[in-house]
């Protein structure tokens, strides 16, 4: 799909190209109380009041998400007009813009429209310019067109009729909007990869499959990749990671993917992704109902790989390292047992009180390994705890960090990207819940504040650099009729790296 940008100030008579240019459809916004957007006012004038007459007739009331097509419109170059309800003008927000864009794309994708002129990016979203509107609209469109059908006997290969979108933006935002469009396409491609990896079944998306995916990213985009196998992992004395992996016949993989967009001496940002490609719970077996969704327990790894692909396509001037420890968590005669004590790469001993708290056991060794890169920051991403879902539901990703500056950067990025996160506490008092009578620490801290104690566990292995933990258990996938991976938190991570790179 092709996206292009054209500057236009609808209020100053510079819209003639949009009025007369050939297009299958032009998209206009309509607020409640019969208030037209700037573009809609100009089109209304060019069509001798057609838009106003339609609104006064009650065919569209401006409520958020309502749409109406006008056909065979005279006075303009577009053969159709799509009116999109924007809701109340005084309540128009970032979310309302996203909902309006989504409604527009859904309406358009149900037609044979090939080329569309999209004016909504210029709507007055508080604290957002039209370049932001372009990016959000492209991501909304790509979300609407995403399909996962490759595992069906007859995959749906049908492509939408829509092939070209022309965005009208404020002239001052023209250059920034072109950058935003490029970044949005790269981000959408990274999110699609993340969603594909999450949606694949566990018998396909194995640790070896993830490793091969990393190799393909490296080959396609010129990155450096190292995949460590069992013997190399053993040589590094990653006893905690290996204790989880040993219960499965699938061999563990330890993936290191490096993107170098800045000077070699520049300290990298390290992203660590939990890669449990299927989590049965191990000996602490999960209930059968809903266990199929434990194929999504590698979404931390998937989001890290998707982010790396997006960063490479954007060409950001920053160094980034992705680390993915990946294995299955399965019950077997040689699997971890409750009460076992294992030794981590750092040398700390861990009492495994619950084998279903395995994510932290593989991440802790990866966090220790990250030290060798002398990182500017380390961010781990994991579907770590059901407790985070209880605390935050399915809207906000849980953010934990003792570094206020790093946490602030991530929260700013989450707001800019529309990929919300919420900071939760990481006070030292919670560490007491991880005490063990027999080892340096236990892998669980009881029911109270389960997401916090999980983050506290990880913090023991991330003391030598700025560190943050993202718990995506509630945001990495959806259940029910809309079951599927979401691609989150790729937008948050990518925006954080864009900001760090100054792009």
Curated annotation (Swiss-Prot):
GO terms for cellular component: cytoplasm. It catalyses: Release of an N-terminal amino acid, Xaa-|-Yaa-, in which Xaa is preferably Leu, but may be other amino acids including Pro although not Arg or Lys, and Yaa may be Pro. Amino acid amides and methyl esters are also readily hydrolyzed, but rates on arylamides are exceedingly low; Release of an N-terminal amino acid, preferentially leucine, but not glutamic or aspartic acids. One of its GO terms (biological process) is proteolysis. It is found in: Cytoplasm. Its EC number is 3.4.11.1, 3.4.11.10. Its cofactor is Mn(2+). Keywords: Aminopeptidase, Cytoplasm, Hydrolase, Manganese, Metal-binding, Protease. The active site is at residues 286, 360. CDD domains: Peptidase_M17 (cd00433). InterPro entries: Leucine_aapep/pepB, Macro_dom-like, Peptidase_M17_C, Peptidase_M17_leu_NH2_pept, Peptidase_M17_N. Mn(2+) 2 binds at residues 274, 279, 297, 358. Gene3D superfamilies: Leucine Aminopeptidase, subunit E, domain 1, Zn peptidases. Binds 2 manganese ions per subunit. GO terms for molecular function: manganese ion binding; metalloaminopeptidase activity. Mn(2+) 1 binds at residues 279, 356, 358. The keyword Protease applies. Disulfide bonds: none annotated. HAMAP family: Cytosol_peptidase_M17. Belongs to the peptidase M17 family. Presumably involved in the processing and regular turnover of intracellular proteins. Catalyzes the removal of unsubstituted N-terminal amino acids from various peptides. This is Probable cytosol aminopeptidase. It comes from Burkholderia pseudomallei (strain 1710b). The gene is pepA.
